[in-house]
Regions:
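C-terminal-biased regions
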Residues: 1-146
Length: 146
């Protein structure tokens, strides 16, 4: 009886995962659009606005990391399995963490030139890769639910 309940709970969690993954697709697109505008805002002297937006984007990407971990566990995806080109869940999470630290350090040191470069080259790249990895996870979800 207990095993049956656990299976039902797990199946329910998997079913609820789909809408969350689709919502995250939209959020990642929104993050990408916002990141593309940040360097221009920096150059226009709107540092406070950029830093505020960057905090919101980082919080959203932190939520993405949590969702990705949960989805991988629920869908039995090995964290070391390559889901997009040579990117696995584990590698993407490490890359995001490393780039978050670089962005935080640049912001703390008020190195806005470096911060702009990190946004343009690293963060935008991370978001694009995150979108592709999420697409792979969503396909796995759809295969499992069907």
């Amino acid at each position: 009886m207990r095993n049956m309940q656990a299976m039902n709970d797990s199946q329910k969690q998997v079913e609820e995962l789909g809408p969350l993954l689709r919502d995250m697709q939209e959020y990642l697109y929104t993050f990408e659009q916002a990141c593309q505008k940040l360097p221009v805002q920096f150059h226009a002297g709107n540092k406070a606005y950029v830093l505020d937006m960057l905090v919101k984007i980082m919080e959203g990407l932190n939520y993405y990391q949590k969702l990705l971990k949960s989805a991988a566990i629920l869908l039995s995806i090995d964290f070391s399995e390559c889901l997009y080109e040579k990117i696995s869940v584990s590698l993407l999470l490490d890359q995001l963490c490393q780039n978050f630290n670089g962005i935080l350090e640049a912001a703390e040191n008020e190195d806005y030139s470096l911060l702009t470069d990190l946004i343009e080259y690293d963060l935008l790249s991370d978001i694009a890769i995150s979108q592709q990895v999420l697409e792979s996870v969503l396909r796995r979800y759809e295969e499992r639910v069907v």
